[in-house]
Amino acid sequence: MDFQSRILGHFNASIDAKTYASEVLPPFIEVASQMMVQCLVSEGKILACGNGGSAGDSQHFSSELLNRFERERPSLPALALTTDTSTLTSIANDYSYNEIFSKQIRALGQPGDILLAISTSGNSANVVQAIQAAHDRDMHIVALTGRDGGDMASLLGQDDCEIRVPSTSTARIQEVHLLAIHCLCDLIDQQLFGSTE
């Protein structure tokens, strides 16, 4: 097997996925960034959740806001709901794994806050329940999905925003999700603190 050819194939597939996504996703990323900025200037916060690689993306996003992205600026309020193992395991043990995010949202979410809900399939049951809990708390949703949007897409209202990656490959969807997250962080900084160019 020619491993270098296989590696090149992955690079090319990633480039193709991002090129295709660049033709359809920018308007949705722009709207999502504007929603997040409105939340932040209104003294709200952004909660984020997902499973596996999407949990990592949730933490990546919140760390970029709490710390910094590519320039010095004040910390911004964001929280990944994926990091507190005592909370996650107690909810999973006492209730259900499907409730590990929704119970946190019911305690922490406030009207006007945003939930960044991440799932490559759009069908993660605990993320679906997180969206339902966020709506119950009068929060808005920014959903990062893939494939056909899954169950998450059907739960979104007119005040929510879905960034759906046009791919069926989990790896390619995750790669575009990370790029979308970086775009969101950049646009938040641009809108709140002005251009650096």
UniProtKB/Swiss-Prot annotation:
Pfam families on file: SIS_2 (PF13580)
InterPro entries per record: GmhA/DiaA, Phosphoheptose_Isoase, SIS_dom, SIS_dom_sf, SIS_GmhA/DiaA_subfam
Record has Metal-binding as a keyword: yes
Binding site for Zn(2+): 60, 64, 174, 182
Localization terms from the record: Cytoplasm
Ranges where the SIS domain occurs: 36-197
GO biological process, one term: carbohydrate metabolic process
Record's catalysed reaction(s): 2 D-sedoheptulose 7-phosphate = D-glycero-alpha-D-manno-heptose 7-phosphate + D-glycero-beta-D-manno-heptose 7-phosphate
Known cofactor(s): Zn(2+)
GO molecular function annotations of the record: carbohydrate derivative binding; D-sedoheptulose 7-phosphate isomerase activity; zinc ion binding
Binding site for substrate: 51-53, 64, 93-94, 119-121, 124, 174
Pathway(s): Carbohydrate biosynthesis; D-glycero-D-manno-heptose 7-phosphate biosynthesis; D-glycero-alpha-D-manno-heptose 7-phosphate and D-glycero-beta-D-manno-heptose 7-phosphate from sedoheptulose 7-phosphate: step 1/1
Cofactor binding remark: Binds 1 zinc ion per subunit.
Broad EC category: isomerase
Location (main, coarse): cytoplasm
Annotated keywords: Carbohydrate metabolism, Cytoplasm, Isomerase, Metal-binding, Zinc
UniProt-listed Enzyme Commission number(s): 5.3.1.28
Regions that span the bilayer: none
GO cellular component terms given for this protein: cytoplasm
Quaternary structure and interacting proteins, as annotated: Homotetramer.
Function: Catalyzes the isomerization of sedoheptulose 7-phosphate in D-glycero-D-manno-heptose 7-phosphate.
Note: The reaction produces a racemic mixture of D-glycero-alpha-D-manno-heptose 7-phosphate and D-glycero-beta-D-manno-heptose 7-phosphate.
Family under the similarity heading: Belongs to the SIS family. GmhA subfamily.
Protein name per its UniProtKB record: Phosphoheptose isomerase
Organism: Chromohalobacter salexigens (strain ATCC BAA-138 / DSM 3043 / CIP 106854 / NCIMB 13768 / 1H11)
